Amino acid sequence: MAEAAQPTGESQGAELTIQIQQPVERALRTPVRRGAQSVLRVSQLLLRAIAGHQRLTLAALKKELGNAGYEVRRKISSHQAGDSTRSEKYTLLRVSGSDAAGYFRVWKISKPRRKAPRSRLTLGSHSHGKTVLKSPRPLRPRSRRKAAKKAREVWRRKARALKARSRRARSLARSMVRSRASSRASSRARSRARSRARSRARSRARSRASSRARSSARSSARSSARSSVRSSVRSSARSSARSSIRSRARSRARTRARSRAKDLVRSKAREQARTRAREQAHARARTHDCVRAKAQEYVRAKEQQYVSAKEQEYVRTKEQECAKAREQMRIGAMEEARIKAIDNRVQTTMEDTSPWSTDEMRSRTKPREEKRQEPERPVKQTNQKPAVVKVDNAPSRQGKTCTKSSTKSGHPGCSGTS
């Protein structure tokens, strides 16, 4: 059995795991002469295909085997037709993958054999359809049959010997592979054991060295502590008085310096607090003054806006009144002019009491069209002088105006603002 695997594939599956097997039928029956050679050839082709392609697919494998003269087809169930004819000549190939999974048949494409030429007599006899009478004597002699039997026996012995040799070779190969694997495993186990022993020895040596160093350090520390204690006891008795006096003096000086520093810090803090309070009071007063000034300015601006709005309204009302007065004056002047014209006509009619002359009659009898075409007589209009208005800007005299009326019209003049 030969195995070959490719890690990745594209078209037929993500992975292809190929395994070559011989069918069970071939093992049960008589062995074929070229069975081992065909399996070896197929395994060699598989190895070449795997080495030649980075990602081996089922299509590429079929192409490689087809170029070498082999045909690959999926195995059909045993009950279908055509299985008995090809069961002895194919090599079983098992492919496992995501999409291409199953058993495939691989067999050598056999070339068509040339038929032996027939004699003319046989052709003629077959063509005419005549049956040839067989002689009661057999065609082959017995000596030839014995030789054939012996040859078959020899061939069977050789086949058995070849089969035994192949089995021995396979067993030797398996034993060699197993021995190699066992030797590799034993070598790996030995190397691991050696590395573990070395690491344990190193760790033990390190632990021993560290323990020795610790023990020496402890012993030296104990001895130094004992000697230091003894020397300190001796020196402490001597220097205790001196150190006590010096420490008392230093403590007194330190307390005095600390008290002075604290007093200075407190005084500085008080002065800073006072200055900050003064600055804050000044800032508050300034802000209050600014707020008051802004409020006063805002109130003044509002008052000015209110006064200006009132003045504008007053001016608008006065202008409207003046316009109305002017219109009334114009209307009165027009009425006076009409009244005067009517009075003048009445006077002329009263004065002309004499009978009508022929010219007047003719003029009166003129057609209406000529009368319409005659130009109208101009009417005298009186020119009126505009009223002069004076307005005092003082707040106490708001609403009071000085008016002057024209002497010709006699009507009161209009009031306005300058």
Curated annotation (Swiss-Prot):
Its main location: nucleus. Keywords: ATP-binding, Chromosome, Coiled coil, Developmental protein, Differentiation, DNA condensation, DNA-binding, Nucleotide-binding, Nucleus, Phosphoprotein, Spermatogenesis. Residues 292-330 form a coiled coil. The modification Phosphoserine is found at residue 38. Residues 127-149, 157-171, 187-211, 245-259 have a biased composition (Basic residues). It is found in: Nucleus; Chromosome. Signal peptide: none annotated. Residues 260-273, 359-379 have a biased composition (Basic and acidic residues). One of its GO terms (cellular component) is nucleus. GO terms for molecular function: ATP binding; double-stranded DNA binding; nucleosomal DNA binding. Residues 114-273, 344-418 are annotated as: Disordered. The keyword Iron does not apply. Residues 172-186, 212-244 have a biased composition (Low complexity). Residues 345-357, 395-418 have a biased composition (Polar residues). GO terms for biological process: chromosome condensation; negative regulation of DNA recombination; sperm DNA condensation; spermatid nucleus elongation. Essential for normal spermatogenesis and male fertility. Required for proper cell restructuring and DNA condensation during the elongation phase of spermiogenesis. Involved in the histone-protamine transition of sperm chromatin and the subsequent production of functional sperm. Binds both double-stranded and single-stranded DNA, ATP and protamine-1. Belongs to the histone H1/H5 family. PANTHER family: SERINE/ARGININE REPETITIVE MATRIX PROTEIN 5-RELATED, SERINE_ARGININE REPETITIVE MATRIX PROTEIN 5. This is Testis-specific H1 histone.
